[in-house]
């Protein structure tokens, strides 16, 4: 019987091991990618935000009353948000938020309702995917008016919206464990004007009170802690500004 030199098998072993290692690497990478994708839920809604301006001779209350009397069908909810601590907002300026399921829902039903009391910059609307954070879902609890804070940030280079979601979700769960009742969202800009930022890096962190008093109480609780200065070094977001405060009116639901 012919003897086989063990040394002649080594190259074949090396090739087999290399193939096995490559296969394992591909499988592990696929599993990690799959797990990461599963951690980011699909958007809960689509927010379409538009800057609007009250016409001379009208008040914001006139705008709200007209909005509530309008014959609207299609969107899930419409909010009018009046700046209280805004970002250089004009005296007659407010934001209209129209909530849809997704882009298809918007495209199937979108109608610009004419108004006698205000005008909107409809050519520069912004489209945001919106995800709920934590477990609180009690915004506007028994009321159609509440307070809302919004903080604009950019996704830090090297991170993605999944990283932002996980970080903010952990933050919100910790707040809820400490008794906070407000709802938190993260919105991700996909369409519309975005000044001085790279594409798809603009986000808004939004907190909505179960009522005006509810959000004020949660803010008081936050203000009593040792507030950090600037965006945390380990956060997946950067260039976060100080939050704005608005009074939000639900005009259609």
Regions from the language model: what does each represent?
Residues 3, 11, 25-26, 162, ...:
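Low-complexity, intrinsically disordered regions enriched in charged/polar residues
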């Amino acid at each position: 019987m012919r003897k086989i030199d063990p040394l002649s098998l080594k190259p074949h072993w090396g090739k087999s091991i290399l193939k096995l290692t490559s296969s394992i690497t591909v499988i592990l990478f696929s599993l990690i990618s799959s797990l990461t994708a599963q951690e980011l839920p699909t958007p809960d809604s689509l927010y379409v935000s538009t800057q609007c301006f009250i016409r001379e001779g009208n008040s914001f209350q006139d705008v709200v009353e007209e909005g509530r009397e309008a014959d609207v069908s299609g969107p899930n909810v419409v909010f009018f948000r009046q700046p209280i601590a805004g970002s250089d907002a004009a005296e007659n300026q407010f934001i209209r938020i129209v909530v849809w399921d997704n882009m298809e829902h918007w495209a199937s039903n979108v109608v610009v309702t004419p108004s006698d009391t205000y005008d909107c910059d409809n050519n520069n609307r912004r489209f945001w995917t919106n995800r709920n954070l934590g477990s609180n879902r009690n915004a506007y609890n028994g009321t159609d008016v509440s307070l809302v804070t919004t903080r604009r940030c950019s996704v830090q280079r090297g991170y993605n919206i999944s990283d932002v979601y996980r970080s903010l979700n952990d933050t919100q769960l910790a707040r809820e464990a400490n008794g906070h009742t407000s709802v938190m969202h993260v919105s991700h800009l996909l369409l519309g004007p975005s000044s001085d930022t790279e594409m798809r890096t603009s986000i808004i962190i939004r907190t909505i009170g179960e009522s005006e008093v509810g959000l004020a109480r949660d803010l008081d609780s936050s203000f009593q802690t040792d507030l950090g200065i600037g965006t945390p070094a380990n956060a997946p977001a950067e260039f976060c500004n100080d939050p704005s405060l608005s009074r939000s009116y639900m005009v259609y639901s």
